[in-house]
Amino acid sequence: MAGHSKWANIQHRKGKQDKLRSKLFSKLAKEITVAAKMGDPDPEKNPRLRLAVKEAKSNSMPKDVIDRAIKKSQGGDAENYDEIRYEGYGPNGIAIIVEAMTDNRNRTASNVRSYFTKYGGDLGQTGSVSFMFDRKGEILYKPDAGDADTVMMAAIEAGAEDVESDEDGHWIYTADTDLAEVSTALEASLGESEHAKLIWKPQAPTEIDLETATKLMKLIDALEEDDDVQNVTGNFDIPEEVAAQL
């Protein structure tokens, strides 16, 4: 999400992490099950599954829950999920991408459309806003992984495309197809990362004011609380002084 560190701080201030934690494990487990079902159930032989397990561990998901999710993929009773992307505009024309995983397309489409309508947005067609984003891999390291120069050199050597460092951490960006490979290479030089995942990176984030941010948060909250929704991304940036008031 644009304004990554500020976004995390806003979620923390709002107590949103606690509110979503009950749903978080089920969303992570769903991704693990789907990744394992589509490929090899061994994370070492399945890059998508390896990243899903890594994300689950970084969110303190118990090992037995992770193992159960993998095992579920191999059973005959595992649900079939469709991966769908919805695109539209939020308040003040902010572009929004919603990634969902569902066993009922009609239910999910209806729910997502209703959230956009209720909170001042407009759901569009696939492709209506994704051209404003780049599909990238994002790897996050804490500030103590090293200074900006050290992390930059390690990232370049590992094959990354870009690095953004500030007091909250180091965000390393890769081509979407290189994420697993770069993540593995960085572990050898910088140790375990906080997360490594595919994202939609806004090409030109729009800085928003308090009124727009407040409206936008209502839409994003509603979307993220839906069981079928895995990720929500927008092309906005929230200034520090606005973030402090949310």
Curated annotation (Swiss-Prot):
SUPFAM superfamilies: YebC-like (SSF75625). Transmembrane segments: none annotated. GO terms for molecular function: DNA binding. This is Probable transcriptional regulatory protein Pden_1905. It comes from Paracoccus denitrificans (strain Pd 1222). InterPro entries: Integrase-like_N, TACO1_YebC-like_2nd/3rd_dom, TACO1_YebC_N, Transcrip_reg_TACO1-like, Transcrip_reg_TACO1-like_dom3, YebC-like. GO terms for biological process: regulation of DNA-templated transcription. It is found in: Cytoplasm. It holds the Pfam family Transcrip_reg. GO terms for cellular component: cytosol. Belongs to the TACO1 family. The lineage of its organism: Bacteria, Pseudomonadati, Pseudomonadota, Alphaproteobacteria, Rhodobacterales. The keyword Nuclease does not apply. Residues 1-21 are annotated as: Disordered. NCBIfam families: PRK00110.1 (NF001030), PRK12378.1 (NF009044), YebC/PmpR family DNA-binding transcriptional regulator (TIGR01033). Keywords: Cytoplasm, DNA-binding, Transcription, Transcription regulation.
